[in-house]
UniProtKB/Swiss-Prot annotation:
Enzyme class, broadest EC rank: oxidoreductase
Protein name in UniProt: D-amino-acid oxidase
Residues binding FAD, per UniProt: 9-11, 34-35, 40-42, 46-48, 161-162, 182, 275, 298-299, 301-303
GO-annotated molecular function: D-amino-acid oxidase activity; FAD binding; glycine oxidase activity
Glycan-linked positions: 39, 180, 224
Native species: Caenorhabditis briggsae
UniProt keyword annotations, A-Z: Developmental protein, FAD, Flavoprotein, Glycoprotein, Oxidoreductase, Peroxisome, Signal
Amino acid sequence: MPRICVLGAGIMGVSTALAIQERIPDSVVTIIAEKFSPNTTSDVAAGLIEPYLCDDDVDRVISWTKSTIQRIQEYMNEGNPGAESQEQSGYWLQSVKSVPKWLEVMKNVKILTGNELKMVAKRPEHKFGIFYTTWYLEPTPYIKWESDKFLKNGGKIKNSKIQKIEDVEKEFGLFDVILNCTGIGARHLIGDNEVFPTRGQILKVKCPSVKHFFIDDQFYALLNDTTITLGGTADRHQWDRTINPKISEKIFQENCKNIPSLRSAQVISSHVDLRPSRVTVRLEAEPDSKVIHNNGHGGSGITLHWGCALECVELVKKVLAGKPGISKI
């Protein structure tokens, strides 16, 4: 039975471990991580399904996103708590017209007419708009759902802070394949200097009267089951996880300009975390190695998670067959 190790327990790590377990049935899969849900970067995410802060080949991103959407629909069909309402519609307003190819996987896509734009635009820079329907995941219950399935199927979970990837087998014994799903941690774990943090600060608020998401060039209001996520910042190469009250206030006030009814919102909490950014997603097996990398998803970890997990399964099969491969296009 092949012994598989997955490093990292955010949505990418847990999904990858579960996908391997389900598709390579004789495998023994172990997740090793320092932090687990609800204390991962994934848990802070709003969970809207659309590529965000992810610089990669668009066809590759679309393929991964389609797999994730199919997965979400399966999750919804199982009747999981809150899953029945995991579609939402809203507006994306822009200062410069952009109709990216990934919109083809969204539903009800409509370019706003001049009159429609006037009805929703709140700033002079809102010169172009798109309405569409997408999906979202509440990350914490979803990761729990996956983790429960993983454990029920015989998966193992170990709590450990691994400093270097070479230390894994010193502490836990030999593995046939080791997958790096450590997000920003890959910078230190394997010395990948192309991984860098993009600092994101958000607010969680309650405002039941808001029924649509709203995104513009800088700010966004995204609906969750019981709250709304207001953002945001995207500060590249910033490691500071300290909440800045002035930034929180600006996020709130600027979103109120876009959605005036937010002024009655109840502020629940503020959060800061570091998106694991990279020039391109690294999803590949190192040549002549047992190590596979699956990291650098930027702000799109939720959007891409299941597509990337399925691709990892194929890479694991190649490594086990003695044919490590590279999945770059």
